[in-house]
Amino acid sequence: MPELPEVETIMRGISPFLEGATIKKIKLNRADLRWPFPENFASRVREAKVLNLKRRSKYILVDLSTGETLLIHLGMSGKILVSGSKIGNYFYESSKRSYHDHVIFELNDGTKITYNDPRRFGAMDLAKTNDVNNHKFLEKLGPEPLGNNFNTDYLKT
């Protein structure tokens, strides 16, 4: 299972490709991951501009221009692959789709962001950006270990 530092590294690695990009197409190669995708998932994400990425615990949060945030959890074996772009060292070349490529986002510049998860323990959901911290995945999480609220005063309580 990707631990918090790896999720942070993945989030930072895909940010240059996603931030400012528009999701032109989305292909769901199955109806669910660990849980079913939210209702109208593809149409709610399609044509949205990616405003920014952040991490909360082991979740990657993708703020969209639609006022919603895409929550991504990698589960035990999930990974995010970037293809069709020559920027950075994240280029992934494959002539055919892997059986475990469950979600493919195609961006306005032709870059493809592929969520691959052999065990399907990962998850994707959408939440209102202004209420994302009350989402069922996030509402009971403790303070962020890299944040200012995780300090000696918190540890004393």
Language model segments and positions:
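Extended, highly charged segments
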Residues: M1-E68, S85-I87, E106, T111
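Phosphate/anion-contacting hairpin/loop surfaces
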Residues: L70-T157
